[in-house]
């Protein structure tokens, strides 16, 4: 067969992009180069750019197209739609030239013969010669047709693929990116179908799509064919896998988030383009579990690493699990085109919203920006034209056809979709904040309503009422002076960890476990340990919350492990000091099922908390769960940069008892390099510092409690709040005692209280006293670093 017009995938390399487009060249590259390394890619063939150009030259088609486009204004959406439709119909009506027709038939017959004469089904996909250039994400600009069989249906699908180079979004996109229409050609790829209609499929990236953090693989997954994930028609499951521990052969799944997965795309019994697939509802039982196993997540992540290493750059990869043979296949791989382009930009832009906020709805945050404007509710594509510059576009889900109007919006909000859908990809590329998968945003938001859309607060994006006060700060990270002390960060929210990873720091000086328990678990540990004793209503609520996990107790341990592992991975191999849960009894009582198990205390700030709680008969089994989670993170997952901090240790007896309890739960001081840090936050800790240090490897000073207990004031009381000041001479005496005791014994001493974040002069005094590290809120890291360098590097 002449390979003028048709080439088999295995004969293609990345050097053939101009002949068969990025998508098909990449399939050929993987089949020929990565099959031996264990990456499975279904085979097939591609038509060439020459074939496409020969087709357009046939019957004077290209002249008619050029004439129609020459006078088109793409900002006129109605005219764009009319001209695009006319051109596409011309293409569908034009038969293939004789040679192309013959080569397609010969290739198809060979494909059928190679399959043993079976009635095979294929995917017919477009691959534009400019589609996957790193500076132009043509994501989903052209069509894909799934479950096509029979030669006539394959040829019809190829006609549709060729026509898709002139759909509205593709025409608009080329103008937007400065491509001439006739320099982009199209290749049709014909690939054996993976039966993910009865399995699962999704997308993965070899970096975090929102922060650009490149030490993770981000995997999305849902039931059925992958188009729903790509189009944003479902909210998929999401997983993060940590590359360094994956390479080391350790369990490396950092985090799992269950998506709603309401529908799945399956095959129909029709085999022609446009009729070969349909969506059906997913049974509730399947929705309430993860669509792929931990073993499959890990296997996919290994494929992602292999592909990324081969291409030498971050990648965006589509995959499918065949429901018949149970195997995982890679369907596409292309360069990631947004975050990896920002590598040279070492400026950090942070958004903060000031004042009171009323949440109208929430979903998955795309990007890390904030947008504001009036709501523009759009039911379908026919209303697109009503979107004006600065509107907040609110709709059920966007179609890639909407790209021409998406760039007018100040923000985008959708009911459906996950972080790898088209709306998300285009929003990222345009630099517009988007909140996807809100569920019912189109019902909760009203046309013309003024809103603020925030993607600056972690994985969850919020739509707030009104045009709120937004503060923007820009920081250049390139020219940071040497810090005169170790600067660390206080981080509680694992969802923000990757965003903070590019801040200059020595690690996390305070990782608050209670944030994980409160936000990501929300249930009292005793209610989970005694699940069988709960009433039916509480059982139902707990069962709903723990969907996807093996048991109530497993849920608690797994969620703590996920949160801590994410925090530790974000700064690995730098230290992460994890404080064991420091809830007070009233805070524990607020958790689901908690009011039954907690005492009522007049002053919980000074009550049943810290070390005394951990060793108490009515809580030590709960503490054991926290220990089990941290042991897993350190010993199984290999994140040995995790250190343990014990808060609120009142007496030397408590210190001895809690160290013993940790050892009994597998967390022995010194074993596998484990350091135990004590929070030095009571006057007794400072006065008896040398004795307390017998049990610990150092102190982290909690200046908040140390101040209130030294000065005898309730920090939660507004009546005496004016007297609260960490810089009070009495407090400084206590801190001096603690720091000097650590220095004398050559043990670690840091501070993780609020004081240094609020008062740079206090941070300076601490450094002069000999403190080893100051742990700051992330938003004050740069400012305090620069202040200390300026004051102390003289």
From Swiss-Prot:
Assigned keywords, A-Z: ATP-binding, Kinase, Magnesium, Metal-binding, Nucleotide-binding, Transferase
Binding site for substrate: 512, 579, 681, 702-705
Listed cofactors: Mg(2+)
Catalytic activity line of the entry: pyruvate + ATP + H2O = phosphoenolpyruvate + AMP + phosphate + 2 H(+)
Annotated metabolic or biological route of this protein: Carbohydrate biosynthesis; gluconeogenesis
Enzyme class: transferase
Binding-site residues, Mg(2+): 681, 705
Note: Present in outer membrane vesicle formulations which are used as vaccines in human. The reaction takes place in three steps, mediated by a phosphocarrier histidine residue located on the surface of the central domain. The two first partial reactions are catalyzed at an active site located on the N-terminal domain, and the third partial reaction is catalyzed at an active site located on the C-terminal domain. For catalytic turnover, the central domain swivels from the concave surface of the N-terminal domain to that of the C-terminal domain.
Name of the molecule in the record: Phosphoenolpyruvate synthase
Encoding gene (name): ppsA
